[in-house]
Amino acid sequence: MPDIVNRKVEHVEIAAFENVDGLSSSTFLNDVILVHQGFPGISFSEINTKTKFFRKEISVPVMVTGMTGGRNELGRINKIIAEVAEKFGIPMGVGSQRVAIEKAEARESFAIVRKVAPTIPIIANLGMPQLVKGYGLKEFQDAIQMIEADAIAVHLNPAQEVFQPEGEPEYQIYALEKLRDISKELSVPIIVKESGNGISMETAKLLYSYGIKNFDTSGQGGTNWIAIEMIRDIRRGNWKAESAKNFLDWGVPTAASIMEVRYSVPDSFLVGSGGIRSGLDAAKAIALGADIAGMALPVLKSAIEGKESLEQFFRKIIFELKAAMMLTGSKDVDALKKTSIVILGKLKEWAEYRGINLSIYEKVRKRE
C-alpha cells in the first residue's frame, strides 16, 4: 500500500512539473468556431452562468475533475481547491479513493474536501479495474460516505494502466455487470470518466447498454497519462518507456469525444474535459455538446501556487466564458448550447469518417 501512496505523490509531481500537457496530441477544439454576433442583443451584466449539476444548482458550467488525495501534502492541495471551488460555486471531483479505502490514514486527505466545501457538488472516485479486483457495493458506499459525495466517478484508464510500471489493465466485461447492479443500489448517480484518452461512441453505447447515462470525456489533448507513466518507466529503467513513446498521441481528441458521446447517447449528461485550458475552451465544449466543461491540470498547478493564484485562475476562466457568451449572444447556458458554430478541419473529417451526420448532429447538440 505505501507504493500506492507514493505513486499518488509522484503522479502529482510529474503532472505539475514535467511537460505532460498536450504534447503531440490535440483536443481538436481549434476546429470549433463560435460564430461572432456583432449585435449580441444582451448586456454583459445580464449573462447568467448558473446551471444544474444533477440535483444541485451551480454558479458556472465548469467543474474540477478528479485529481488527487492520499497523503497529507495532497490533502492540503485538495483543501485549497475545495475552499476556492466552494467560494465560486464550482463542483469538485477528488482523485481515486482506493488508497483511502485500503489505508485508513489516507482518508482525511479526501474527507477534508467536504469539511471546507459544505454546499457544492462533490464527486467521489474509484477505478473500473477495482471492480474486477473485487470491489463492490460496500466500497462504493464507503467512497461516497467518506466525502458525502453527490455523485461518484468511475474512471477508465486502460492506456495508463498498460504503460504503468505496476499497472493493472483489467477490463473484463463482468465489471460492467457489477457496475450496473451497484448503480441500482446507490443513492447518487454514477459518472463514467476517461483519463486523458477520450470516450468513443462504441464505448458510450456499451456503457449505456449497462445503464450508464453520465459521462466525462477526458479526451486526448490535455494531461497525457501515457507520458506520465513513460516518465515513471524511464526513472525505473523499465523497457515499457520506449513503447510508451509510440503512443503519446493515442486517443479520441476531446472535441471528437464530445461529438461521439452526444451523437450516440443523446440524452446523456456529459462533462467535456481534456485540455480545457480557458473559458473559451469551456464555451466551445458546451456549444459543441457538453453540459458542462471540466478541467484538472491547470487547477492543480494554480493550487500548488496557493489559494490566491487559484482564485485568480477561476476569475479568468469565468470572465472568458462570459465573454464568449456575450459575443455569441448567449444570455444563459441553455442559449450557449444552441449558439451557432462552425466545425472545420480535422474535427469535421473525423466526424464524417465516423458516420456522424453533421445536419443531424446540429439538432442533437441543441437538444432539439
From Swiss-Prot:
Changing Q160L: 28-fold decrease in the catalytic efficiency and 5-fold decrease in the affinity binding for IPP. Substrate binds at R7, K8, S96, Q97, R98, Q160. Mg(2+) binds at E161. GO terms for cellular component: cytoplasm. It comes from the Archaea. Keywords: Cytoplasm, Flavoprotein, FMN, Isomerase, Isoprene biosynthesis, Magnesium, Metal-binding, NADP. FMN binds at T65, G66, M67, T68, S96, N125, K193, S218, T223, G275, I276, R277, A296, L297. Its EC number is 5.3.3.2. GO terms for biological process: isoprenoid biosynthetic process. It is an enzyme of class 5 (isomerase). It is found in: Cytoplasm. Signal peptide: none annotated. One of its GO terms (molecular function) is isopentenyl-diphosphate delta-isomerase activity. Changing D216A: Does not affect the proper folding of the enzyme, but it shows significant reduction of isomerase activity. Changing E161A: Does not affect the proper folding of the enzyme, but it shows significant loss of isomerase activity. Belongs to the IPP isomerase type 2 family. Involved in the biosynthesis of isoprenoids. Catalyzes the 1,3-allylic rearrangement of the homoallylic substrate isopentenyl (IPP) to its allylic isomer, dimethylallyl diphosphate (DMAPP). This is Isopentenyl-diphosphate delta-isomerase. It comes from Saccharolobus shibatae (strain ATCC 51178 / DSM 5389 / JCM 8931 / NBRC 15437 / B12). The gene is fni.
